[in-house]
Amino acid sequence: MRPFAIAFVGLVLAQPGNVLNGNWTANFQGTTYVRLAFADGATAPQGTMSIGQSIHVDVEGNVDNATAASSTPTRMLDTRWNDGVLSFGINDGPDVDRFEFRLIDANHAELAMILSEEERRQAAAAQMPLPKPFRLTKTP
């Protein structure tokens, strides 16, 4: 019975949601502009996200100005864990914004905005640089 119990504990700890569980933030000059919170779901991690209304990046795609994340988080939609990447959507009015969350290590991750080809074309036409993934840190 003991080998079974040890194997079960190993299986539970290997589930992706357990590594993600908790709060993750991205900060710029003391301002938290992205906040995510994860918990285990039945088939995939579940969570909420809040993000600042304005995030500006320099020509290289690095954040150089950001407003604080909303104090009211939005529930993640359509969460999918695939090959070490959690993809999800956030309802933004009539649109759903897509993101990918990728762990770097137990306390650091990257959050990338997933833009459609049309959004990429519009940004290029307006000579707007695309943002690099936001660097997140797990907070206690």
Regions found by a protein language model. Name each.
Residues P3-V12:
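Sec-dependent N-terminal signal peptides
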Residues G17-R98, Q122-R135:
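Central antiparallel beta-sheet cores of small beta-barrel/beta-sandwich binding domains
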Residues F101-R102:
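Exposed beta-sheet edge/beta-hairpin loop segments within beta-rich domains
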Residues D105-N107:
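Residue-level recognition of beta-strand termini and adjacent short loop/turns
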Residues T139-P140:
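Short, solvent-exposed mixed-charge patches
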